[in-house]
Structure formats: structure tokens, C-alpha cells
């Protein structure tokens, strides 16, 4: 959520910056609402002052024994109270209208973000590794997994439906090995604290990280909306679309000491997404699932440190790919392809041989103070009384299923077996090939 002053005193400049990412801010409506708000604010304050002044006169009239005057003043005070209540209600309604508009406004892109309309105008900044040239016909991960009876899409369809998977034997073990390897790397070498978090979260948490109110259709929600347990209404819960939600919300409504910053947290969780806008896309294989595992990286920093932290966090995700010896490229998203709450985002795209292209495997973003303002996540500098908003960052380190896709396809052999990357073998009890 943007600073409200940007939508009051810097409206035209803010609209211009938002236009860079293809968002049209309704300047005229906001300006009119703000003028009405100011007028009502003044009226409310005047009515409050009049009521307070007249209320004091009641005691003075009674002290003089003029009860008739006291009654008349009390009637005036009651009328002023009614007017004040009406003005306050109108002011609250106006403020809610302004807030509703503000909640639909995305973050402002950083000046370093390239201009562009969509993903075709993202800018490649690095390419690591060289895709192998195979002397045999390359198979995709679906064929490789089904040949080895390690990926069972048919059973998943029977149990749950499309966009789910059952993994078996060494394929399930490889999936587990990947997540263990990622967690060990991030906790032992990159300085993150491992977290175990709920997979069901409340609306306040989803609001804090920006999924609500705008992206509710992308989530899986529990039903009914509320239920009574011991006379206490429970809020509707939703399955997490990413561990970013529960992990980042650890700092909601808190004030962190400057000495404890930055906070660096990681969590391995399943993620659940409805893929509401992805009908017909990536219907084959593990690329786009309703349920998938991911190791998430979250950093909570001081404002002046967040851009350097984005480079660091992205580097931590890159290290996973490098140790797995998977060719990838790094792109900075253009203004038209950025996520709703992002100030700046890097995508890491891994080489997928069967598709002969790079596919996203990690997205690393600096959210600036956008989430922090919603969450009231703050820190206090040493010697200062007033707390400041933190900056929040998050990124995949990595998506486990897509990493598995990359390993199956990049490490396939002519006979259909899969070589296990060297760094994973200790997690596989020394197994060198599967399939």
C-alpha cells in the first residue's frame, strides 16, 4: 500500500510514475474525494469545537441558577452532537472510498526498472552455464518420469484432478533431497533462520502481503466463511499461495530493534494456487500445478539496505542453480510485467531442454515499504523514539518441482536414466542414477 500522502499532495507525480507500469490512476476522482474529505474534516472539527464550547456553558448556567438557559444549551449540544455524528459518518465513508481506491493501486517501480509493456520487454542481465548438446532424442520430464514409474499423473487425476502429481520411489526421494539441500544451503551458508509455519492463514495475513483484496480468486479458501466454535466466530482461512505470506507476517504489528536487523528467514512449504488465469497454459507436466513445494527466502531490512539486500537474496537463489549445475539466465522485469506489490523484481529462468527455452524458477522482489505499511511492520533506530516502516523482500530459493523438472531433463541419459547432481548424492544415500 502506497503512502497516503502520495495520493494527496503528490497526486500528479504519482500518477505519472504509475503510468510507467501501465496503471491508470483515477486522478480526478481522488482529487474530488480529497477536497470533500478536507471540507468534511474542517466541518467535523468545527462542530466538535462548538459542542465542547457549548457543553462548558451548561455548568455555568446551572451555577447561576438559570435552569431554563441550561436546558436550552443542552438541547443545542444534543443537536450539535447529531450533526457531528452525521459529519463523522460521512467523513468515514469518504475515507473508506479513498482507502478502497488506494488498495487497488500497485507499487511504484524503482527508477532502475526498465520500461516495458510485458514479459517480452524484460531485460536479460546475466546468463550462466551452457545448455548441453545431446546426441540422442531429448525426452521431456513427463516421459522420463512415466517410463521409470516415478511420476504418476493418472493416480493424481483420480485422487484430486488435473494439475496434481503423485511421485514414487526415487523420484519422491529426489524431490525431498532437493528441499533438504536448499534449506541446508540457505541456513548454513546464507544465514537464514529456518521457519515452520502454518499452511492456512487468515485474511489479515493475506491483506498484509497484498494477496487480498485484489487476488482472492487465485487462492483456495476454506468453507464456510465463518463457523461457530465455542461461541467464537472463526475467520475464513485460506491455503497459502507461497510461504511469503506466513513468514513475512511474522513482523506484522511489531517493532523490531535496529540491532536485530536484517531478519533473514526461510521456509519449505507446499503452496496452493487456483491458477484462475492460466486455463490452457502448461497443462502437461509439473510446470504449473495447483499444489507444489517451494523453499522461500524472506528478508526484513532497513530502508537504506533493501536494494543491496535484493541483490544478495537473488544471489542466494542463483547459488542453488549453480551448485546443481543447471544453466539459467537472470532477467530484470520491466515495468509492465512486475508483480502488484513489487518495487523491483529479478526472475531466474532455468534451461528446459525439451522446450528449448528458459522457464521461470525463481522470482525475487523488493517490496519496499508496500507490505510493511499494510502490516504496520516497523523498526526503531537506536536512540530514536519514533519507529519507521521496514522494507520487505522475498524470493523463491527455489521452486522444488520446477527444479526437479530441470534436473530430470538436463541430466537425462541416452537410456532414459537420470544422473543425480553431485551435491544431491549425499541426500540420496550415494545414488548416482535413477530411472
From Swiss-Prot:
Pathway: Aminoacyl-tRNA biosynthesis; selenocysteinyl-tRNA(Sec) biosynthesis; L-seryl-tRNA(Sec) from L-serine and tRNA(Sec): step 1/1. One of its GO terms (cellular component) is cytoplasm. It comes from the Bacteria. One of its GO terms (biological process) is selenocysteine biosynthetic process. It is found in: Cytoplasm. CDD domains: SerRS_core (cd00770). It catalyses: tRNA(Ser) + L-serine + ATP = L-seryl-tRNA(Ser) + AMP + diphosphate + H(+); tRNA(Sec) + L-serine + ATP = L-seryl-tRNA(Sec) + AMP + diphosphate + H(+). ATP binds at residues 273-275, 360-363. PROSITE patterns: AA_TRNA_LIGASE_II. One of its GO terms (molecular function) is serine-tRNA ligase activity. It is an enzyme of class 6 (ligase). Pfam families: Seryl_tRNA_N (PF02403), tRNA-synt_2b (PF00587). L-serine binds at residues 242-244, 296, 396. Keywords: Aminoacyl-tRNA synthetase, ATP-binding, Cytoplasm, Ligase, Nucleotide-binding, Protein biosynthesis. Its EC number is 6.1.1.11. Residues 41-70 are annotated as: Disordered. Catalyzes the attachment of serine to tRNA(Ser). Is also able to aminoacylate tRNA(Sec) with serine, to form the misacylated tRNA L-seryl-tRNA(Sec), which will be further converted into selenocysteinyl-tRNA(Sec). Belongs to the class-II aminoacyl-tRNA synthetase family. Type-1 seryl-tRNA synthetase subfamily. Consists of two distinct domains, a catalytic core and a N-terminal extension that is involved in tRNA binding. Homodimer. The tRNA molecule binds across the dimer. This is Serine--tRNA ligase. It comes from Aliivibrio fischeri (strain ATCC 700601 / ES114) (Vibrio fischeri).
